Amino acid sequence: MKLIITRHGETEGNVKRILADIDDPLTSKGIEQAEAVSKRLKKERIDAIFSSPFIRAKKTAQIIAKYHPNAKFIINNNLKEGKLGRYLNKKMDEVNWDLLPKDVENRTSLYKRAKKIVNLALNKYPKGIVIFVAHNAINKAIIRYLRKLDPEDKNSILQGNTAISIFQISNGKIKEKLFNCTKHLNKIGNNYV
């Protein structure tokens, strides 16, 4: 399976550097970013598009899907952003990710969700091309899982808006083909929130 991982386009929460809720829609720049990643991926023969149910990811996935009318469009809760608890609507610099309160989803929980969604896609589309459209925290967990890193690994894995990472999974072997590539945004710009 060829797995393409991308993050949603820019939102107001990204611009303001706050941790936003499920209804944070794409900005006009976020829509441009989604259009750019869509055009970049239009020659891929995508079999399935898995999306988070959150508006920002779903809209990005819908824009990608316009070039892939035969791809199965699947909303999956395992691709939701991490549960933010008391960190919801806080500024990024107000948050201590090393000492998470109990109401904030930890890296191990995200890693378990990552494992579930990767294995689900792999079982349904073992020879297919699949794209995940999701969020920063869960995408980082998916990449940690595919790299066989410890769930609590704190190494910074950047996830720019609509950045693309590609992994080839075959016969139990995983090859990373591309990581956090945003060349499709050269004329638009990107941020790393």
Language-model features: locations:
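Generic beta-sheet signal
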Residues: 3, 126-136
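Loop-to-helix element that buttresses phosphate recognition and phosphoryl-transfer chemistry
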Residues: 3-59, 103-115
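General small-molecule cofactor/ligand-binding pocket signal
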Residues: 4, 74-76, 177
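Short active-site segment of divalent metal-dependent hydrolases/proteases
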Residues: 11, 138-139
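Phosphate-coordination/substrate-recognition cap region in phosphate-metabolizing enzymes
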Residues: 35-101
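Glycine-rich phosphate-binding loop signature in dinucleotide/nucleotide-binding domains
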Residues: 43-45, 121-129
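Domain-level recognition of soluble alpha/beta enzyme cores
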Residues: 150-175
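Acidic, His/Gly-rich catalytic cores of divalent-metal-dependent hydrolytic chemistry
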Residues: 177-193
